[in-house]
Every structure is written in C-alpha cells, then in structure tokens.
Swiss-Prot record:
This is Ribosomal RNA large subunit methyltransferase H. Its main location: cytoplasm. S-adenosyl-L-methionine binds at residues 76, 108, 127-132. It comes from the Bacteria. Gene3D superfamilies: 3.40.1280.10. Disulfide bonds: none annotated. It catalyses: pseudouridine(1915) in 23S rRNA + S-adenosyl-L-methionine = N(3)-methylpseudouridine(1915) in 23S rRNA + S-adenosyl-L-homocysteine + H(+). It is an enzyme of class 2 (transferase). Its EC number is 2.1.1.177.
Length: 159
C-alpha cells in the first residue's frame, strides 16, 4: 500500500523531525510512505476573509499538484468525521480491499484547506474539535497510521 502525506509548511523543530523519522521507519514494514511538504503562504496580520481564501487557494493548488488521479484522498478537517482508531484502521483496510492502494492524507496550513482540496477529498476526517499546530499534527497522523496497521495485523500496541 502507498501512503502519501501532503502537508503545508516545513517542519523546523528537531523533536518533531525525530518523531516523524521514527514513525516513518516503523511504517516501512507496512507501507510505502511518501511525505510531501508544500510551501506555506505568509498570512498577514489581520488578513481579510478574502485574503485568507486567496492564501488557501494558492496552498490548495500546490497540494492538488501532488495528488494522483487514482488516490483515495483523506482531508484532515475540523468539520470532518471523528472516528476511533479501530474505525480508522477499517477505513485503511476498506481502501485496500476496494482497490485503492494509494491513500493521500492532506493536512492544510494554519488557515485550513481550500474548497478545491475539500471537494477532491473522498473522505473528510477530524481528529478532534480542538485545533492543533499543523506541524505537530503530522506526527499525530503518522502515529495513528502506524497504530492502524498494527491493529490490522493484529499486533499488540499500547492503548
């Protein structure tokens, strides 16, 4: 199975890079992982709604360039569906069983995802109603993908 994580912005903190590297290494047993970072647009202080939408559109266009036609796209969105880790593993397994061997997870920047990206998504997923820094969220997503594969393989994992 091919898993892509397409996210806005670069990871700067060493501790987050270390966590991403660790989960990437762990996931190599289960899937081919591709992490793609697209440039984030600078948001001016007190940006208008119109300016925010333009920024999201620019970031969205960069994201869409990396999504393959055959990808099952899961957008990480506050308005998405909240599911358990077990349901998340079922979602990944259902993709595999229905011939979707490529899953693209999309993480937006600080303003979220553009409407074009949300429209392209096959599934909208929310981890929480809380807001997280998008750099930290990448680690959280990798952990949940790793947990999902451990669940699918009936391997022990800390609960």
């Amino acid at each position: 199975m091919n898993i892509s994580i397409i996210s806005v912005g670069k990871i700067k903190e060493k501790f987050l890079k270390a966590a991403i590297d660790e989960y990437s290494k762990r996931l190599s047993k289960y899937c081919k992982l591709n992490i793609i970072e697209v440039a984030d647009e600078k948001t001016p202080d007190n940006a208008s709604l119109k300016e925010e939408n333009i920024i999201k559109e620019k970031e969205g266009n960069l994201i869409l360039k990396h999504i393959k036609d055959n990808s099952f796209v899961i957008a990480l969105d506050l308005k998405g569906k909240s599911i358990t880790s077990e349901e998340f593993s079922d979602l990944i397994e259902n993709c595999r069983l229905t011939g979707n061997s490529t899953i693209a997870f999309v993480i937006g920047g600080s303003l979220g995802l553009s409407q074009q990206v949300l429209s392209r998504a096959n599934y909208k997923l929310s981890f929480s109603k809380m807001t997280f820094p998008h750099q930290l969220f990448r680690v959280m997503l990798l952990e949940q993908v790793y947990r999902a594969f451990r669940i699918l393989c009936r391997e022990p994992y800390h609960k």
